[in-house]
Amino acid sequence: MKVKVYNMDGSEKGETELSAVFETEYRPDLIKRAFLSSFTARLQPKGVDLMAGKRTSAKSIGKGHGRARVQRTGQGAGAFVPQAVGGRRCHPPKVEKILHERVNKKERLKALASAIAASANIEMVKNRGHVVETVPSVPLIVSDDFESLKKTKEVLETFKNLGLDGDVQRAKDGIKIRSGIGKLRGRKYRKPKSVLVVVSGACDAVKASKNLPGVDVISANDLGVMHIAPGADSGRLTLWTESAVEEINKRF
């Protein structure tokens, strides 16, 4: 599979050969399993103090007194039981609970290959909601000069030349204040995902690109399903550098 390579000014540079990974069968079931595995691996186990709600001298006087057999303090107030103020929790969370949903290594690689192939399908990219009318090619590959960019304005200018600025603007317009209690827990804004930039490794473009709305930057060796199919929704608009494509070809 041959695709065009573009310079940063939007002109054609030449062609490059893609490996068979970009033509992998679409497996949404594997993609979802791999995403859930990566997502749950980040969850932190939590539990309660084993003595929470039990630090009291309250006791029950037993039956035959015409009142509930609730454990009571010396003043007659209920304590210890879950329905009492300051009592223990009923079925509290436990640190022993297994949160991480594991997946086999071959399944994870198959899921990643399937997600990469989905990002090279223009119809799936459209269905995910990305703005691709001005994008010259999907998958979109740019010369390695992109990795030397040091300024965000230079990255944005390159995005404009390659027709990616429309999707960045879509993500910027879609930033909303989250409904619910999550806004009090460090998740105030709901931010849509826009362009994923895949580079060959550590470079100046990583810092220069990540400040754009919805844009993520990742090296080819660290690329995972969470990056190219966030929310287990495959078909993310992706910008590859030439060296990144070579690294992916080696990886698969």
Curated annotation (Swiss-Prot):
Per the record, its GO cellular-component terms are: ribonucleoprotein complex; ribosome
Specify whether Ribosomal protein is a keyword of the entry: yes
Q: Which InterPro entries match?
A: Ribosomal_uL4, Ribosomal_uL4_dom_sf, Ribosomal_uL4_euk/arc_CS, Ribosomal_uL4_euk/arch, Ribosomall_uL4-arc
Key words of the record: Ribonucleoprotein, Ribosomal protein, RNA-binding, rRNA-binding
Gene Ontology molecular function terms on file: rRNA binding; structural constituent of ribosome
Pfam assignment, any one: Ribosomal_L4
Give the GO biological process terms: translation
What the protein does?
One of the primary rRNA binding proteins, this protein initially binds near the 5'-end of the 23S rRNA. It is important during the early stages of 50S assembly. It makes multiple contacts with different domains of the 23S rRNA in the assembled 50S subunit and ribosome.
Q: So what family is this one in?
A: Belongs to the universal ribosomal protein uL4 family.
- Cross-referenced PANTHER family: 60S RIBOSOMAL PROTEIN L4
Q: How does it assemble?
A: Part of the 50S ribosomal subunit.
**Protein name, please?**
Large ribosomal subunit protein uL4
Q: Which organism is it from?
A: Methanococcus aeolicus (strain ATCC BAA-1280 / DSM 17508 / OCM 812 / Nankai-3)
Gene name of this polypeptide: rpl4
